Structures are given as structure tokens and as C-alpha cells.
Amino acid sequence: MAQHSKYSDAQLSAIVNDMIAVLEKHKAPVDLSLIALGNMASNLLTTSVPQTQCEALAQAFSNSLINAVKTR
């Protein structure tokens, strides 16, 4: 999704590939995959981001996701 990142493409690809492998291992359909990924994102936000920044970061993530789908 991000166009500019402090992380390497290799780091991102490795994590994404692992996550895809887990979803494939469980034969998760698209809706279940999206629910799981949404729960993961919510968990990361609520446990790792200060409450004062949580909503703004969630909105930025949502906007980035929408833009990624639009430009596909």
C-alpha cells in the first residue's frame, strides 16, 4: 500500500508472503481473510499505538487501503 517506506521491499515481501501462506494453509475464503486481517490491524492499533493517535492512524490506514484499491 505505502509508496514510500523506511522498510525494505524484501522485509515487506517476507512478511506478506508469510501471512498469505497462513491464510492459504487454513483455506480461508476472502471474507474470513479480511476479517482476520481487520482484527489484526485493530489489535495492533489498540495495543501498540497511543490512544490519542489511534483514530488518526486508523483513518490514514483506511485512506491508504482505499487508494490502493482505486489505483489497482
UniProtKB/Swiss-Prot annotation:
This is UPF0352 protein HI_0840. It holds the Pfam family DUF1414. HAMAP family: UPF0352. The lineage of its organism: Bacteria, Pseudomonadati, Pseudomonadota, Gammaproteobacteria, Pasteurellales. Belongs to the UPF0352 family. NCBIfam families: PRK13689.1. Transmembrane segments: none annotated.
